[in-house]
Structures are given as structure tokens and as C-alpha cells.
């Protein structure tokens, strides 16, 4: 978005001593993806009154880029084998080596590390080319990190005609599934078992799923599915996942004794090992074949959940669900969500709760968001859910919400951050900057307001509903005015919702 200056996010927070002990003092661990590097550091002398300063540059470069100093936030009770301060450097270039320097405030304690982002050109070893078939194709063999096993389905269709549970089953690692059209699986389009480092790209998946006794789709059955907690390094890119065989119920429809939406999903990964990337996909359906969540699964009130640690979700189009467009709930340790467009969903981004963090949400845009009259939680849900599942004690991770936009087509967009039909959810450890929080109705808060909300930092947002009084003083009250030809083009997957130069908030960010 051009209306606010881009914020470079580098967050290093949360001190935790695991039952396995700490890493050696000042040892840095780096976990890269294509455009980000997650960092973990254990400096001697870390404490609540000391921030961590961050700098990075391309290896051999002269100019250091500085990050934001972050808070110290100890969390106990998890067996996750993690380091104290942690966070992410984002907006990086693939296949590029970076020098990273961390310094503990007020001390001479400093350390550096060199880390390289992922290449987008994965090496190919063996290639297996498939033609059309009507039975499941199972992948048992593995490639290596130096030579992936490519299963090439370009121009091939696997239509199992509801006679097999899956179109493709993957049990091998270092595997690329490319170019398939997958149809009519009894349960799920692609099943991932005990595998890692699997790339699913340029696939078209549709028509999967079974029907339950109430006539809705079976819960969690998905275009891409795994219930293995050991999978990690899963990349889903440039896929179209659409039109499951059956519908999910809305919050106004009884299903299996309750009103919570239940039914098919685009992607289901239960409590995975993380380091997953979901990018450049179109996951959508129609009003008669709605998803439960578009992507998600796992245990919300936990240190695990979806999408797993050190994972990225970006540049996707998500639509047509009765609950969450993106269900990023649980640990959210170095989870990064950016540049997605979501519409025809009840709730664009769910994060209840973020128990470890940090969670980054930036440059996402939501369109029409809706649930039928009589829905259990009202017609309009929050843009970002906030709150918790099970216990408020899970709300211990930090969250950073920057440069997002809530659109209000025909006044049918999402509610504010943590706000649905004027119900205000808990918010803790959240920082906002440069968001356009148009809630369409001034009687609804743009950000949840309740006395229990603590350790938050709000500023430089454009808002037209209620806004917490304890803010930084630079937020702007008003309704956005977009350029004359603001648009979203589904066929081209392009959009432009820049602010008009005469609009409040134009060029007024931090």
C-alpha cells in the first residue's frame, strides 16, 4: 500500500528457559525462508529493562539496516526447545546471504551470524512424469536436499471418481508435486504423512470430501491435508484449491449438535513442525460449497497450532468460508502473514491465542466479510480475532499489526481489531501502526476497548470507530478516501486500494 511508509519489522522478544536448557550465551540461531529469517538468541544478562538492537545487511555491503528494539517477555510452561530473545527480519530477497548483528542494550554484549535465504530454484534429481489416471498415486521414495524428486503432472489429471480417499499420498521427503489437476477424492486431494521438505506447486485441486449425517462436509477434509506433527518445510505455491464436494455450516446452522462452522478446508495442517510457506495461491469456492476455515487446524489454546513456527503465509487470495480465512492460532512463534487479500469470509485472520510469538501481520486487505442473520456471534467478525481459547493465560506472545486495510464494500466489511458487532475481545502484547481501520459504523470500535487489555501500543492508525485512549497520540480519526479507480481484479489477481492524496492518513504514517 502506498498510503503509509513501509515499516521494516525486526522483532526480538520473549525470554524463555526450556526444560532442555539454554543455548550457549550469545549463540544465534537463524531459520530462513524465501523472504524472512527467524532469529533466536540467548545473551548473558538479558532482562526486562534491556532491549535488543538489531542490524542486518547483505553480506559484504556497507549499509546496515536497523531494526526495532523489542521487549523482554519471559514465557514458561512449554517444552518447545527455543532460545530467549527471538524475532524475524522480513522483506528480504531470496537466495541472498545476510550478515546479522544483535546487541543487548546498555552492554557490550553483541554477536553476529551469516544466514542465507532460500533459493526459488530447487535442484532436481530424478523426474517421474505421469499421465492421466483414476487411482491414487503414492510417493514413497525421497530425493535429497541437493536433488529433489520431481513428480511432474503437467497436463495430467488424477480423477479418482470418489473411489479412493486421496488423489496423491506423499510419504517421501525432498519431493516436488507439480502441475497436477486433482479431482473427486473421497476425503482429501493430497495427503502428507511422515514427510518433510515437500513442494506442492501449480496444482488445481477440487471436488474432494465426504458428507456427514447432517448433510454437511466432514470437518477438516481438505485439498491438502496432514495430521502428522512431524512434517515441516512444506511449501504450497501457485495452486488453485476450490469447490469441495460439500458445504460447511455457518454460525446460523446447526451441525453435529453445535453452531460452530464445521466442514471442508483448503489446507489443513495439524500442529506441524513448522518452517512452512503458503504463497501465491487462490483458495476459493462458492456460496453452496463454503469452507469451514480456508486454511488452518491444530490446537488453538496451546504452544503448537497452525501454521507452525518460522512459517510464512503471503500473497494469497482466500475466500468463501464461514469462519476464519487464516486460522493462525496457537504458538505463532515467528509466524509471518502479509500481503493477502481475503473476502467472503466471516473473520479474515484468527490469532486466538498467540502463546509464544512473535506474530507479524502486515499489508493484508479484507473485502466483504459476512455471516447470515441469526449467526451465533453476529453478522460481522473482527478483522483480526484477538482473545483466547480455553484460558486467558495463553495470551502471552507479542503481536505486530502494521499497514493492513479493512475495506467496507456496501458497509459489509469486517469489524475492527478484536471487535465484532460491538463485542470487544481481549488484546494483550499488541503493537499497531499505519492500519486503515474503517469499520463502517462509528458506533463500533476500530480496536477493542476494555479495561483488561494490557501491554499494548497503538499509534499512527487511520480509524473511524472507537480507539483506545491510551494511544501514542498520532492516530487519525476519519474515513479513508481511495483513488477513483480502486479495484480488485479476480481474473488478474491484481488490486490497488491506494489512498487518494486528499484523504486523511495519506502519507501520514510512521
Language-model region placement:
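Recognizes extended acidic, P/S/T-rich segments that occur
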Residues: 53-95
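Extracellular beta-strand/beta-solenoid scaffold signature
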Residues: 162-168, 184-191, 213-228, 249-270, ...
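Right-handed parallel beta-helix
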Residues: 127, 148, 152-156, 173-184, ...
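Acidic, glycine- and Ser/Thr-rich low-complexity intrinsically disordered tracts
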Residues: 144-146, 254-267, 424-510
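Extracellular beta-strand-rich solenoid/capping regions of secreted or surface-exposed proteins
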Residues: 91, 133-150, 158-198, 211-231, ...
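Solvent-exposed loop/turn segments flanking beta-strands in beta-repeat/beta-sandwich domains
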Residues: 44-56
Amino acid at each position: 500500500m502506498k498510503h503509509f511508509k513501509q515499516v521494516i519489522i525486526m522483532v526480538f522478544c520473549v525470554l524463555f528457559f526450556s526444560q532442555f536448557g539454554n543455548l550457549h550465551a550469545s549463540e544465534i540461531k537463524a531459520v530462513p525462508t524465501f523472504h524472512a529469517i527467524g532469529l533466536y538468541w540467548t545473551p548473558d544478562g538479558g532482562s526486562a529493562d534491556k532491549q535488543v538492537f538489531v542490524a542486518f545487511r547483505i553480506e559484504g555491503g556497507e549499509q546496515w539496516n536497523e531494526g526495532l528494539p523489542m521487549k523482554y517477555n519471559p514465557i514458561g510452561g512449554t517444552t518447545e526447545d527455543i532460545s530467549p530473545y527471538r524475532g524475524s527480519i522480513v522483506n528480504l530477497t531470496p537466495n541472498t546471504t545476510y550478515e546479522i548483528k544483535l546487541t543487548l542494550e546498555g552492554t557490550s554484549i553483541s554477536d553476529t551470524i551469516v544466514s542465507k535465504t532460500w533459493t526459488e530454484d530447487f535442484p532436481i534429481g530424478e523426474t517421474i512424469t505421469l499421465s492421466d489416471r483414476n487411482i491414487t498415486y503414492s510417493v514413497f521414495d525421497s530425493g535429497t536436499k541437493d536433488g529433489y524428486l520431481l513428480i511432474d503432472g503437467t497436463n495430467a489429471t488424477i480423477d479418482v471418481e470418489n473411489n479412493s480417499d486421496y488423489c496423491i499420498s506423499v510419504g517421501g521427503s525432498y519431493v516436488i508435486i507439480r502441475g497436477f489437476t486433482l479431482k473427486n477424492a473421497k476425503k482429501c486431494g493430497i495427503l502428507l504423512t511422515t514427510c518433510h521438505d515437500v513442494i506442492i506447486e501449480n496444482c488445481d485441486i477440487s471436488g474432494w470430501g465426504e458428507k456427514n449425517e447432517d448433510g454437511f462436509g466432514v470437518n477438516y477434509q481438505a485439498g491438502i491435508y496432514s495430521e502428522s506433527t512431524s512434517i515441516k518445510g512444506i511449501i504450497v505455491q501457485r495452486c488453485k484449491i476450490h469447490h469441495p464436494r460439500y458445504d460447511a455450516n455457518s454460525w446460523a446452522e446447526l451441525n453435529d449438535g453445535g453452531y460452530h462452522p464445521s466442514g471442508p478446508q483448503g489446507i489443513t495442517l495439524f500442529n506441524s513442525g513448522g518452517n512452512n510457506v503458503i504463497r501465491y495461491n487462490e483458495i476459493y469456492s462458492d456460496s453452496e460449497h463454503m469452507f469451514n476455515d480456508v486454511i488452518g487446524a491444530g490446537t488453538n489454546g496451546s504452544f503448537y497450532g497452525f501454521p507452525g513456527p518460522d512459517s510464512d503465509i503471503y500473497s494469497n487470495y482466500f475466500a468463501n468460508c464461514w469462519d476464519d480465512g487464516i486460522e493462525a492460532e496457537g504458538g505463532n512463534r515467528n509466524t509471518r502473514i502479509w500481503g493477502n487479500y481475503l473476502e467472503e469470509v466471516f473473520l479474515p485472520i484468527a490469532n486466538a491465542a498467540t502463546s509464544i510469538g512473535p506474530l507479524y501481520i502486515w499489508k493484508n486487505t479484507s473485502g466483504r466479510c459476512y455471516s447470515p442473520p441469526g449467526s451465533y456471534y453476529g453478522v460481522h467478525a473482527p478483522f483480526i480475532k484477538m482473545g483466547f481459547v480455553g484460558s486467558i493465560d495463553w495470551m502471552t506472545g507479542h503481536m505486530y499489526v502494521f499497514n493492513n486495510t479493512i475495506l467496507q464494500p456496501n458497509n459489509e466489511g469486517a469489524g475492527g481489531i478484536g471487535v465484532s458487532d460491538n463485542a470487544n475481545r481481549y488484546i494483550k502484547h499488541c503493537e499497531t501502526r499505519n492500519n486503515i481501520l474503517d469499520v463502517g459504523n462509528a458506533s463500533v470500535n476500530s480496536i477493542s476497548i476494555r479495561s483488561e487489555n494490557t501491554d499494548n501500543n497503538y499509534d499512527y492508525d487511520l480509524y473511524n470507530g472507537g480507539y483506545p485512549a491510551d494511544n501514542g497520540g498520532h492516530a487519525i480519526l476519519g474515513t479513508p478516501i481511495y483513488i477513483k479507480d480502486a479495484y480488485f481484479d479476480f481474473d488478474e489477481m491484481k488490486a490497488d486500494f491506494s489512498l487518494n492524496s486528499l484523504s486523511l492518513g495519506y502519507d501520514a504514517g510512521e
